[in-house]
Amino acid sequence: YARLITQLFGEKMFISNATGCSSIWGGTASISPYTTNKESGFGPAWINSLFEDNAEHGLGMQIGYETVRANLITKVEALKGKNADLDAVIDKYLETKNNTKANDAPAKALIAALEACGCDESKEILKDKQYLAKKSFWIFGGDGWAYDIGYGGLDHVLASGHDVNVMVFDTEMYSNTGGQASKASNIGEVCQFAAAGKEISKKSLAEICMTYGYIYVAQIALGANMAQAVK
């Protein structure tokens, strides 16, 4: 699942990963399953946070990046009309500023145009040129984090209205600690350390998220339908 997302977003991704099973295979010391692309040599930016504050950490990454970027966009807008060679490039950049995929090429073109310009205003923008492109912010974690230990923070982030994405690896148990029942476990489910079976139903995290009215929720299974999972 993580590989599929990185194939879709690649170097445009920022990932905040909760401690747990997804961080064990996702960032154990000396190895990493994440890689760079052949064209630019860059890949996803990945960082591991605590179990209990991963959602807030991911939101902080997004707010911090977008705050710097908003300041740069203001400076870019101020350049309009001062240099005829820059105007067309600036217009294309501003038209796509809220689209991660569409903004990639215009951002690179803007950086090249600013470097060619050499004016004082362009130099000021180029100091933080890595913030010009629109990025995709992701919060990764297992069901122990999303349904239980980190749920309060996750709910806060989802209620904030900020542009972040959340991927929950729902194994329906605490996988990292050996197999205890979690709030994601189904009624009657038997785990290694919950042999008596769970007596209550699975928490419906998807339905809870949908009650906000503006959150897009999808549940996928790669083995069931790869095409639908990609959509």
Give the ranges of each region predicted by the language model.
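N-terminal amphipathic, basic-rich helices that act as targeting or association modules
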Residues: 1-19, 23-30
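Carboxylate/His-rich catalytic cores and anion/metal-binding grooves
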Residues: 14-24, 67, 74-75, 79-82, ...
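Generic structural signal for well-ordered, non-membrane alpha-helical segments
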Residues: 2, 61, 65, 69, ...
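N-terminal leader/propeptide and maturation segments of large enzyme subunits in energy/redox metabolism
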Residues: 50-121
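Terminal amphipathic helices with adjacent charged low-complexity linkers/tails
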Residues: 23-51
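Thiamine diphosphate
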Residues: 25-26, 35, 117-119, 124-231
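Alpha-helix initiation/capping motif
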Residues: 9, 18, 95-100, 204, ...
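A broad, structural surface signal
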Residues: 3-11, 70-77, 152-155, 159, ...
